[in-house]
Amino acid sequence: RLGCAWSVSELDKRENTASHVLARFRGFIRAAATLITNIHLPNFAKGSIYQGAGKTVCVPGLNCYSCPAASGACPIGSFQSVVGSSKFNFSYYVTGTLILLGVLLGRFVCGFLCPFGWLQELLHKIPGKKLSTKRLKALTYIKYVVLLFAVVLLPVLVVNDVGMGDPFFCKYVCPQGVLEGAIPLAIANAGIRSALGHLFTWKLAVLIAVVVLSVLFYRPFCKWICPLGAFYALMNKVSLLGIRVDAC
């Protein structure tokens, strides 16, 4: 029994050591993940997006397909594209990829591998008044509503004359799309710039709101809105590398 207790203690020590190592190199890990996710940097100057074989693979974090430098596809965008097609094919590939990532990593993806999560943390470091989210815990349930309706149901149920649904989250909600996709493409591509309209204005307003809130609150989009975070939060309970908050 003593030997067993000692073993459990040793396992706890190893777990704490691993956690400290991850925390120490967290900034480097996030920077590396962001660079790998957006490796095609020359495309920013070209005003075009990468369309190679890598776009058939989903990246783990929230990263827009339309970003000129994006090396892979956004899982949320990919899922909506498939379920919103005129033939409605359930996206087994994307769902399977998300489940695999969720089981293996859980919300580790949100804290270490997501470019937009990292951006919010950097914004929160801007000096100024900070507000707590403790009294706003009820808002954390919004992201599950967004996941169910904006990502799954609306693209399937609200369709046009040929039976195709809009990617509602990507089109009307996601601030990462306008930050990584619309803005850099419009800067470098006159044709895209001339085509910008009311939808771009709306998405830009959403982005500005998220930026302002990120300075005041810690990762507000992740906590309250992100459907990808909602999915990983559900999987975090069974993940091999879960994120736990210390009692202290």
List PLM regions with ranges.
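Non-ligating segments of multi-cofactor redox enzymes
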Residues: 2-248
